[in-house]
Amino acid sequence: MEFNVKSGSPEKQRSACIIVGVFEPRRLSPIAEQLDKISDGYISALLRRGELEGKVGQSLLLHHVPNVLSERVLLIGCGKERELDERQYKQIIQKTINTLNETGSMEAVCFLTELHVKGRNNYWKVRQAVETAKDCLYTFDQLKSNKTELRRPLRKMVFNVPTRRELPSGERAIAHGLAIASGIKACKDLANMPPNICNAAYLASQARQLADSSANVSTRVIGEEQMKELNMNAYLAVGQGSQNESLMSIIEYKGNQDPESRPIVLVGKGLTFDSGGISIKPADGMDEMKYDMCGAATVYGVMRVVAELQLPINVIGVLAGCENMPGGKAYRPGDILTTMSGQTVEVLNTDAEGRLVLCDTLTYVERFEPELVIDIATLTGACMVALGHHYSGLMSNHNPLAHELMNASEQAGDRAWRLPLGEEFYEQIESNFADLANTGGRLGGAITAGCFLARFASKYNWAHLDIAGTAWRSGKAKGATGRPVSLLSQFLLNRAGLNSDE
């Protein structure tokens, strides 16, 4: 689908459809008022008859509006003008895209980007419109024998900005939005793959393909033999019960040739299937444990964004691929593992495996002398209990980094919420037999998992994103969400000096 930006008046647009907003109760937006004036009150007369109230989610398609060059005018309900926020704005864009596809409009000019959204500029509105539109059009049908295709799919969308002076900002918003949308799609495609296809070797193949197709990107893969030499015993233990080899894929992007420039490292938990191991999970919903690699899928998607935008920074993405299965060789509750860092861990529950994979990976990345490290993981059900499906959990040992990530989450509309790492929580992961235990009980489970990881991240500035509640949806709309690709992409754009205020 093609996106463009322009500046012009609605009555002069020759298009299959132009899109304008209507507020509650039956109040025309400024652009809709222009069309109403040109059409001698045609639109306002329809509203007075009760054709459209203006509530969010409502729409009305008009054909051959008098004195308007476009074939059709689509009125979209925007709710109450003073209450229009970013969440409603995205809902409005979703409704617009779905309606256009239902009506068979192949191209359209959208004036909704001129609506006033609290605290948001035109760059944000255009970029969010692009990301939301691409998300609406996403399908995962690679494995279906009968693919359903729209008869007349939407092919082109033009966003209008108020003045020509804002065209460069709009064009930049489209470029950024398309790159991030592409990264989100890559993340979702990888996460939605079934575990009989997507194992650690598949993650490695995707990493290699990215290096082959992108400038400034290289990839290397660490297998089990090298992990043994590195004493990555916690990582190795998790995969012992599986016939699929554990593989750690390292994607390195070099956008800054300055030898003094230290890399930003992203570590993604890549449990391509998590049965729970010996501490096996309930059968109900276990199919969704293919999504336990959404951290790795996120890192892969973000590396795609970085490579596409050719950001002038150095970024290393690590996909910590593994599979947790029961079996005669599987690790057990009661085992004590010596991690790569030398710290020992008592295994109380084999279903608390993600932190065991991550702890050795966090030690491994010390060799890159990173500027900072962010790990992304579907780590705990406790985070879902705390924050639901709306916010990712954020923990950090460095306040400025936490503030940067929170700011990026606000900018991107990909929300996170910071949780504490207090000393009291560390007491919950003490062990009678080892340096620490791999679980700290039910209470504060998301935080004790973060505390566990923090014990392996003391040599650099570190943040942890628990995406267990935000990485995928269950139910009828089951599927990966692509979060938090947008948050991390915004963080890296800010780091590269390419934020929305540029």
UniProtKB/Swiss-Prot annotation:
Cofactor(s) needed by this chain: Mn(2+)
GO biological process terms, semicolon-separated: proteolysis
EC number(s) given by UniProt: 3.4.11.1, 3.4.11.10
Annotated catalysed reactions: Release of an N-terminal amino acid, Xaa-|-Yaa-, in which Xaa is preferably Leu, but may be other amino acids including Pro although not Arg or Lys, and Yaa may be Pro. Amino acid amides and methyl esters are also readily hydrolyzed, but rates on arylamides are exceedingly low; Release of an N-terminal amino acid, preferentially leucine, but not glutamic or aspartic acids
Predominant location category: cytoplasm
PROSITE patterns: CYTOSOL_AP
Key words of the record: Aminopeptidase, Cytoplasm, Hydrolase, Manganese, Metal-binding, Protease
Record-level Gene Ontology MF annotations: manganese ion binding; metalloaminopeptidase activity
GO (cellular component) term, any one: cytoplasm
Top-rank taxon, per record: Bacteria
Cofactor note: Binds 2 manganese ions per subunit.
Residues reported in the UniProt entry to bind Mn(2+) 2: 269, 274, 292, 353
Family statement: Belongs to the peptidase M17 family.
NCBIfam families: PRK00913.1-1, PRK00913.1-4
Functional description taken from the UniProt entry: Presumably involved in the processing and regular turnover of intracellular proteins. Catalyzes the removal of unsubstituted N-terminal amino acids from various peptides.
Database matches in PANTHER family: CYTOSOL AMINOPEPTIDASE, LEUCINE AMINOPEPTIDASE-RELATED
Protein name as it appears in the record: Probable cytosol aminopeptidase
Species the sequence originates in: Proteus mirabilis (strain HI4320)
Taxonomic classification: Bacteria, Pseudomonadati, Pseudomonadota, Gammaproteobacteria, Enterobacterales
Gene expressing this chain: pepA
